[in-house]
Design a protein with these regions (language model features):
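Signature aromatic-anchored transmembrane alpha helix within multi-pass, membrane-resident enzymes
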Residues: 16-17, 119-120, 196-197, 225-229, ...
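Short acidic/glycine- and proline-prone juxtamembrane loop motifs at membrane-interface regions
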Residues: 37, 62-65, 134-147
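Short hydrophobic/aromatic helix or loop-helix immediately within or flanking a transmembrane segment
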Residues: 45-46, 50, 61-85
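Membrane-lumen/periplasm interface segments of multi-pass, membrane-embedded glycan/lipid transferases
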Residues: 52-58, 217-218, 236, 240-304
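Hydrophobic, aromatic-rich transmembrane alpha-helices
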Residues: 109, 200, 206, 280-313, ...
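Membrane-interface transmembrane helices that cradle and orient dolichyl/undecaprenyl
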Residues: 114-116, 155-173, 181, 205
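Hydrophobic/aromatic-rich transmembrane helices and adjacent perimembrane loops
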Residues: 138-139, 145, 190, 291, ...
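Membrane-embedded, lumen/periplasm-facing catalytic core of multi-pass transferases
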Residues: 379-439
């Protein structure tokens, strides 16, 4: 047992060292190129506003997404005044996502070993998984998918162990992982549903005929689903208290569903605007990033059925549940269909490849045949990597990634930093510049004087927007309406970006390489 413990720590240490250097190094390079994940930066902004705005409060989140990624960066953001890059380049998010990426790979290695792989082979397969673009890029860019993957694999590992060991303590860990997953990303609700159904069926099967069969499988379901219920209820209550809506993501114009509906024309350009086209598009994405995942999953399920091993259902419930909801959301028009949303197919397929390899390792029959088959499977996990990296450069399949590159080339963040520097140079008092941080959050993050802004999360934002002069607001900062269709300032003063709407005069303008203009208007005093 001691030897196994030392071996496990050593192998985990190799994964930790390799992935930490890889993800942090890639993160530094991406930040240096101004290739910033917009969702990652907005989550850092939520955490930043909770600490450094003129009205700091933990409910500064927009309540449109899970709060955990924003809360996780707050300890790092406390050092932002001394290390501005933590906020200005959202590098605090990169540190957190890199940590989560490292944790995810450690958990993936342990799952591969649990599925029967040897230590060295598990290291190799984990290394292949770690350099996959859908794993590496979120971990190096601050994207929340890295945190979601870590907690999903944590739940998967413990669910797989429970399916094999029937230890109720494992279900406590499963429930904890799923509850955390919901607080990262609401799509985790599908994993919760699939897991609870799986636990219900398996627990009932195990306890059938017993005197306390009913109470036992209900207890197991409570352990697996209870933390999610608590997280769901508490977050809904917090949303109600802060925004007046139980589910702000569905009610707000800034929610993903509303934004996806608004951008449907752009999505229809690549799908043809029909179900067949959408299915073809999703299939192309899936085949590009995980072309053999379906094959590995199918083979593993056949082997598991033959061996009567329910362990493979753990990844199917958690990873497969999240993936299924992502696909359904896109087909229903509630999602942008970003390439990164295919993420869960990658580890699911890799884990099932590991299961096949583990079966070959422990199997019977000619050793030469089993070794040859194992090499074929191992090579099959490696060969698709170049195709997956190519997919991230395809403007049709990887629309979000290409937008990030175009933004960097256009100098958008450099232009926004110029806006922040100019406002800082004015030495304005608190609350002098009103802006909708749904769109201007990079400017606030780049500023060394964040309290000069009146921002959307401020509890007196609406009051100051209704009467800027009385509220001692001197300027309004707005951008192109085509890129800010739900801007609160433009809604209050229609036409302000074009001509000041009769209430303000143009003070200054900044234009980036794509022609996107930021305009600073000074409110006219009576």
């Amino acid at each position: 047992m001691k030897e196994q413990g030392r071996s496990r720590v050593s192998e985990d240490g190799i994964i930790i060292l390799f992935t930490a250097v890889l993800y942090l190094g890639a993160g530094v390079w991406l930040a240096g190129q101004d290739i910033v994940h917009p969702d990652a930066m907005s989550r850092v902004a939520d955490g930043y506003f909770a600490v450094f705005s003129r009205d700091p409060h933990l409910t500064a989140s927009d309540f449109l997404r899970g709060p955990l990624p924003s809360l996780a960066v707050i300890p790092l953001l406390l050092f932002a005044p001394m290390v501005p890059v933590l906020a200005a380049k959202s590098f605090a998010g990169v540190v957190v996502s890199a940590f989560c990426g490292v944790l995810a790979m450690v958990l993936a290695r342990r799952l591969l070993v649990l599925f029967g792989m040897g230590g060295g082979a598990a290291l190799v397969l984990t290394g292949i998984l770690a350099v996959h673009p859908l794993i590496l890029l979120p971990a190096a860019s601050g994207a929340s998918e890295s945190m979601l993957l870590a907690v999903a694999l944590y739940a998967t590992l413990n669910l797989t162990r429970w399916l094999r060991e029937d230890d109720p303590w494992r279900l406590v860990h499963v429930g904890t992982g799923l509850g955390l997953a919901y607080l990262v990303c609401h799509e985790a609700v599908a994993a919760v549903a699939a897991t609870v159904v799986l636990v219900l069926v398996v627990s009932w099967w195990r306890s059938r005929g017993g005197a306390r069969a009913g109470s036992l499988f209900l207890l197991d379901c409570s352990l697996a689903g209870g933390p999610f219920v608590a997280a769901f209820a508490l977050w809904a209550l917090a949303s109600r208290m802060a925004t007046g809506s139980w589910f702000a993501a569905g009610a707000s114009w800034h929610g993903d569903a509303a934004q996806a509906a608004g951008a449907r024309a752009a999505v229809d350009e690549v799908t043809g605007g029909n179900l067949d086209g959408a299915l073809t598009y999703l299939s192309a994405q899936l085949l590009a990033v995980a072309p053999l995942a379906i094959l590995f999953i199918a083979v593993a399920l056949v082997i598991a059925t033959w061996r009567r091993d329910a362990g493979v259902l753990g990844p199917a419930a958690v990873l497969g549940g999240i993936l299924a909801l992502e696909e359904w959301a896109f087909l229903s028009g509630w999602s942008f269909g970003w390439l990164r949303l295919q993420l869960m197919a990658v580890p699911w397929g890799m884990l099932m490849a590991g299961y096949v390899l583990g079966t070959l390792r422990a199997g019977v029959g000619r050793l030469a045949f089993r070794r040859a088959t194992a090499w074929v499977v191992l090579i099959a996990t490696l060969v698709p990597l170049p195709v997956a990296w190519w997919a991230t450069t395809d403007p049709r399949l990887a629309r979000e990634e290409q937008q990030a590159v175009e933004v960097a080339r256009s100098g958008q963040y450099a232009t926004q930093a110029q806006v922040a520097a100019y406002l800082d140079s004015l030495d304005l008092p608190e609350g002098s510049v009103i802006t909708d941080t749904t769109y201007s959050f990079p400017i606030v993050l780049a500023s060394r004087r964040p309290r000069q802004f009146v921002i959307t999360p401020d509890r007196d934002f609406r009051e100051k927007l209704d009467d800027p002069i009385t509220g001692r607001v001197r300027y309004a900062l707005v951008t192109d309406p085509q890129r800010s269709p739900a801007d609160a300032i433009a809604a209050r003063f229609p036409g302000i970006h074009e001509n000041g709407a009769g209430v303000a005069n143009l003070e200054r303008q900044w234009v980036d390489g794509r022609g996107v203009a930021w305009r600073l208007y000074a409110f006219a005093t009576p």
